[in-house]
Amino acid sequence: MALVEDVFSLSPKAVSSALASLWRPIQGGVSAPLGFQAAGITAGLKDSGKPDLALLLAPEGAVCAGMFTTSLVRAACVDLCVDHLQACGGKARAVLINSGQANACTGERGWLDSLRASQALAGRLELPVEQVLICSTGVIGVPIPMDTLLAGLDPLVEALSDEGGAEAAGAILTTDLVEKQFALEAELGGRSVRIGGMAKGSGMIHPDMATMLGYLSCDVGVEVDAWQAMLKRVVDCSFNAMTVDGDTSTNDSCLAFAAGELLEQEHLQALEAGLLVAAQQLAKAIARDGEGATCLLEVQVEGVVGDVEARRIARTVCGSSLVKTAVHGRDPNWGRIVAAAGCAGVPFDPAAVALWLGPHQLMEFGEPLPFDRLAASRYMQERVDGSYLCDDTVQIRLVVGDGSGDGMAWGCDLSDQYVRINADYTT
């Protein structure tokens, strides 16, 4: 489903609110920008019979930027993406995504299978093989059933459409409960500009890329180096600022395509603002869809020396199992929050700490304040009962000094359902 709720909850220092407000949500996803096509089909890669093969095709002249897992154990498709982007100078045009098999820890066969898939698709699209990227998601150690995948390429290409974003978003899911897609539009330099996106992720989610796949598209031209730098800044404040369970994956990838008339230099900051809005919304959707989650957790940290340090504290709080279980139990246990913040490796004065849980202030000058525990617990329960990605967010605000740095991170609560899902994942 398209996520068109209020999304402009950006860090004040990430982008100005004036630039973010230029963008308005529209229906659609990754194929919403002009010239982009997408498709998603059921090829038979999953035993469940659910959609499992997706394709995104960018117009001629597109540039592509990529961010990938930081894990030393990387899937073959990640290595292939890196190699192909280098070989084509960032001029990739297509990405094929299979779900069901991660094709990680599969040795030389895994690499050859990814290469074979890219070669087969390149032939059908009449593209140089270096312009075709491959992404996989699913169970680690399981190779792709190549005969099944290759048999699915012809119907997949035939299904390409500028209205195929929703089908593509559905075909990349694994344990996700909902599709994650989003689109925006703005007037920049007297012309309409659109940004689209889709993502998947539910478990094995942690900062520095997580078991997530993210795809962004835009119908203006941007120089390759500027586009790559822009994507890195955006990912640092979105996909790298979320956590579900603290585990980093072998397959994490975020690819961004831009194609169209070159955008004037003076509008690049506004474009980045829109890209950040889209990426943050997708990141929040991933965190909210965390396995077994009942609510979204948003932590804002202020008062440290810089934004990077603020995000580090926020991520640490979001990732704390004790904080996450307290939120799930609707327990306003503020001690767990400040204890987690103190473990982030960022210096601050504990005597300067102030803390809020939603509208309830819990601490001031490093000491607890009297507060209505039942009301604070009720605040969290009301978020659980709220509507999806609208008023279902438990908000924590932590001020640790008078520095200029601020940052946000997103996570979710931790339930017994998460344990059941992952205990039974391969059985």
Curated annotation (Swiss-Prot):
Entry keyword Transport: no
InterPro entries xrefs: Arg_biosynth_ArgJ, ArgJ-like_dom_sf, ArgJ_beta_C
Marked site: Cleavage: A210, T211
PANTHER family tied to this protein: ARGININE BIOSYNTHESIS BIFUNCTIONAL PROTEIN ARGJ, ARGININE BIOSYNTHESIS BIFUNCTIONAL PROTEIN ARGJ, MITOCHONDRIAL
Role played: Catalyzes two activities which are involved in the cyclic version of arginine biosynthesis: the synthesis of N-acetylglutamate from glutamate and acetyl-CoA as the acetyl donor, and of ornithine by transacetylation between N(2)-acetylornithine and glutamate.
NCBIfam families registered for this protein in UniProt: ArgJ, PRK05388.1
Protein name in UniProt: Arginine biosynthesis bifunctional protein ArgJ
Record organism: Prochlorococcus marinus (strain MIT 9313)
